[in-house]
Structure formats: C-alpha cells, structure tokens
Amino acid sequence: MTGKALLKPHWLRVKAPQQQRIGEVAELLKGLNLKTVCQEASCPNIGECFAGGTATFLIMGPGCTRACPYCDIDFDKSPRSLDPTEPERLSEAVAQMNLRHVVITSVNRDDLSDGGASQFVACIEAIRQRSPLTTIELLIPDFNGNWDALAKVMGAAPEVLNHNIETVPRLYKRARPQADYMRSLELLYQVRQGWPKVYSKSGLMVGLGETDAEVIEVLEDLRRHRVDIVTIGQYLSPSPKHLPVDRFVTPEQFEYFRSMGETELGFLQVVSTPLTRSSYHAGEVQRLMAAHPR
C-alpha cells in the first residue's frame, strides 16, 4: 500500500455531528454490549445517523474471518463463540430506540457451518416479538455459497435482503480475495427467485481502481439478477495499511450512475452520492415499499 495519498475533495466534508445525541446512542449501545458497523468500520455518516437515532447493528463480531484489504473491521481467524444473549440485547436496543426500520449486518463467520445464519434468524425473531411493526433489513455475507443457510435466513422473512457486490469483477482478486463475484450475483438471484416479495438490494464502492464503464457493467449484471435497490458510494481508505483511494468520483458522475440505473436499467431505487453507504438512509426504504407494494 504505497503511493502519495490523494487530497480529499470538498464534497466529502460532513456536517459537524450533534454530540449529545451521539453520546446518548453510544451509551445505550455500550450498556447493551452491542456493536455497530457505524463504529467498527469508521463510517463517515456516523454523526448524522446517530443524531437521527438510527444505527446498523453488527452481530457475531467483533472479529471477521476474512481480511478484505479495504475494510476496517478486525480480522480474526478463530473468532469467539456466538453469544446466545445477543438477539435479546439487540431487540432491547431496537425497542429503546423506537426504530421503525432496523438494519442488521454481520462479520463473515466462515468458521461456522451455516455462516451464522441461525444467529440472524434468532435476531429477527427477537425483534418481531418485541417490536412487531419494525421492518427489518439484513446485510448478509455470501455464506460461502451455502444456499441452505440463505434459505434459513429468508425463512425468517426480512423485508429487505442486502448483499453487497462491493466492486467490479476485475478488482475482486485484489480487494475481495476470499469472495467470488458470480457467487454474489447468484445469491442475489436466489433471493428474488425464491422469495419474490422480499426487496433485494446490493451496493458497491467506487474509487478502488475501476472505470465508469465497469461500474455500468456491474449495474447491468445486478439488474439482470433482479436486484431492486442499489447503493453507490466513494471508497475512503481507513488507514495507510489499507488499499489506497485510486480516484475521487465527482458528485456529477454519481448522479449519472443514479440516472442510468433508474431510468435506463429500471432499478426501483439507486442511491448514489459520495457519502452513500449501504445502509445510509435505509429507513427511506419504507416509502419505497409503500410505493411498490408486493
């Protein structure tokens, strides 16, 4: 990871966060011993999301069995056993925060036979029991292509299923050496084929070395695999030890990706801005579901 770092452009500046609300949410999460991807992955939107009383919960962590060189979550080849109290603690946080829409994601757990699918199910069931009106979005790993594990998760009936494609296929060996582009596409297709009422979602980063043409090709692939919602955001390197930023994509180009995806390719929604992350403003999906009921 060498080379001079690019200077961050002005459009990547974020508003000063509301420290009081951030502190309140952080204290709640600490008290319940819960992690968020907002904190663990150094998300630039943490101030806005915490100030709005929302968070994307990270389960089965903190260590991840994969070591993707763009990601700020710690690698752990032998992570701790799953915590059976985690689902109940998560449901308590959702209830206390009075969330209308909750996003749950996880680290990769390749050490588990089902990749952690059972823990996702337990979390959904706990939330349904305590907060039955809250809609649930899952951001899942690829389960190493274990479609039985996927079926287990989908059987718990989340409203939205997200699996991020992350980058263009040419960069997989460099950025996602333990993942497979076609496997991720197949997972997304399986979701729409087997559970057509569920809204499928995926996301990718730009600035890792891809071209604009390659981004469009990924969008075309995602649409062919019947994905409904796509997020596109700027990659920001967490540290000098991680993959460097290759380019900063302009807001105008992000708008082009959005327009192409929605008007030409027919996605229900493309959220494409420099600061977009896969669960940024995820609560807006409720309006999308109301406009396109299934």
Swiss-Prot record:
Subcellular location: Cytoplasm
Biological pathway: Protein modification; protein lipoylation via endogenous pathway; protein N(6)-(lipoyl)lysine from octanoyl-[acyl-carrier-protein]: step 2/2
SMART domains: Elp3
PROSITE patterns the UniProt entry points to: RADICAL_SAM
Location of the Radical SAM core domain: 50-268
Coiled coil: none
Amino-acid positions noted as binding [4Fe-4S] cluster 1 in the UniProt annotation, renumbered to this chain: C38, C43, C49, S279
GO molecular function: 4 iron, 4 sulfur cluster binding; lipoate synthase activity; metal ion binding
Catalyzed reactions: [[Fe-S] cluster scaffold protein carrying a second [4Fe-4S](2+) cluster] + N(6)-octanoyl-L-lysyl-[protein] + 2 oxidized [2Fe-2S]-[ferredoxin] + 2 S-adenosyl-L-methionine + 4 H(+) = [[Fe-S] cluster scaffold protein] + N(6)-[(R)-dihydrolipoyl]-L-lysyl-[protein] + 4 Fe(3+) + 2 hydrogen sulfide + 2 5'-deoxyadenosine + 2 L-methionine + 2 reduced [2Fe-2S]-[ferredoxin]
Database matches in Pfam families: Radical_SAM (PF04055)
Positions that bind [4Fe-4S] cluster 2: C64, C68, C71
Keyword Cytoplasm in record: yes
Stated family: Belongs to the radical SAM superfamily. Lipoyl synthase family.
Protein name: Lipoyl synthase 1
